[in-house]
């Protein structure tokens, strides 16, 4: 448990230190894509490192995902736990894919470190109001030319209470009753799919089934290691030509439900951690020298603390502007 707690503290300090201390001033002055992409990649590498060595999570995957050149791919997944997003980002990092686009509540921009990645990137920020969100999706997709959109059609993570409510809802409405999954929602997913398809920007449609041996986050603190199985597959887009989108999605979720029941029969490969040495070296080099300077140089200490305070103030003002615009 001590190792896991240290890992959480480490990743929290890293995100605050790296974003507010160094990258924020550059983003405020000029929101160059280079800084955003560097931050995303660096965060991916750190996420993979912490999941593996902090929480002892072993990723096992049945197939790789490839990014389609000059197209926008969509990756859908079940939402089983708090760390699902980090698991998928780590999986994509193992596959050397850093051009990811996340979908989430706009309130995420207030999360230190991760909030900056979500705010300045091309990520789709939702207000949970469909009329507003539909416009946001269409507007944001105009800026996305290439990459992989990662989304959870269930809209919320798995809990026993939500699971039982979903089963009851399905029975009342004559829908498939799942044994391991929540009921997926099709509206947002369909809007993204149709937008990309109509503009000839749609690449591959991927599905990832996440299977955790320990669903409860508390269980991760109690064990030294745990396995996460990822069953990836390419979905046939042509099926949607003659099917209702909602019915098609429910059908795919039934297939996912069966995959979870039989996941032990599938052949997996361990995803070994191959960290990008350039990013690791850059981070370690910067942090080591900064901490040395903080200890040895009083003037720099004051400068650095002032920089962080200014970055927080400017970022807060920028966030208010962002919220008003969106």
Positions of predicted regions on the chain:
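Short helix-loop capping/hinge motifs at secondary-structure junctions, enriched
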Residues: 237-241
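Short proline/glycine-enriched turn/loop segments at secondary-structure junctions
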Residues: 217-223
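Membrane-anchoring hydrophobic helices of lipid-metabolizing enzymes
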Residues: 1-74, 86-87
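Soluble catalytic domains of membrane acyltransferases
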Residues: 54-217
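A glycine-rich helix N-cap at a beta->alpha junction
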Residues: 229-235
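Membrane-helix interfacial anchor on the cytosolic side
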Residues: 55-59, 313-326
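Juxtamembrane amphipathic/hinge helix adjacent to a transmembrane helix
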Residues: 243-286
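Alpha-helical bilayer-embedded segments of polytopic membrane proteins, i.e.
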Residues: 1-21, 271-320
């Amino acid at each position: 448990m001590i190792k896991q707690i240290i890992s959480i503290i480490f990743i929290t300090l890293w995100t605050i230190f790296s974003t507010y201390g160094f990258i924020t001033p550059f983003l405020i002055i000029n929101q160059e894509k280079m800084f955003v992409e560097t931050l995303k990649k660096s965060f991916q590498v750190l996420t993979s490192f912490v999941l593996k060595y902090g929480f002892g999570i072993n990723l096992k995957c049945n197939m790789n995902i490839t990014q389609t050149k000059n197209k926008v791919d969509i990756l859908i997944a079940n939402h089983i736990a708090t760390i699902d997003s980090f698991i998928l980002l780590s999986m994509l990092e193992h596959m050397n894919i850093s051009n990811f686009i996340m979908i989430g509540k706009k309130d995420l921009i207030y999360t230190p470190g991760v909030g900056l990645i979500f705010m300045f990137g091309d990520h789709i920020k939702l207000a949970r109001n469909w009329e507003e969100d539909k416009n946001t999706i269409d507007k944001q997709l105009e800026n996305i030319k290439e990459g992989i959109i990662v989304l959870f059609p269930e809209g919320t993570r798995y809990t026993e209470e939500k699971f039982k409510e979903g089963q009851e809802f399905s029975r009342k409405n004559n829908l498939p009753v799942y044994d391991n999954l929540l009921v997926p929602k099709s509206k947002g997913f369909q809007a993204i799919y149709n937008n990309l398809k109509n503009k000839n920007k749609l690449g591959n449609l991927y599905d990832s089934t996440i299977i955790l041996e320990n669903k409860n986050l508390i269980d991760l603190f109690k064990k030294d290691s745990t396995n996460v199985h990822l069953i990836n597959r390419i979905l046939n887009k042509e099926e949607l030509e003659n099917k209702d989108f909602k019915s098609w999605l429910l059908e795919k979720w039934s297939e996912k439900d069966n995959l979870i029941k039989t996941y032990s029969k599938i052949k997996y490969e361990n995803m070994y951690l191959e960290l990008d040495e350039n990013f690791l070296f850059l981070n370690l080099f910067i942090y080591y020298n900064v901490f040395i300077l903080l200890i040895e140089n009083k003037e720099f200490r004051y400068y650095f603390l002032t920089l962080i305070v200014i970055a927080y103030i400017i970022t807060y003002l920028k966030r208010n502007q962002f919220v008003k615009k969106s």
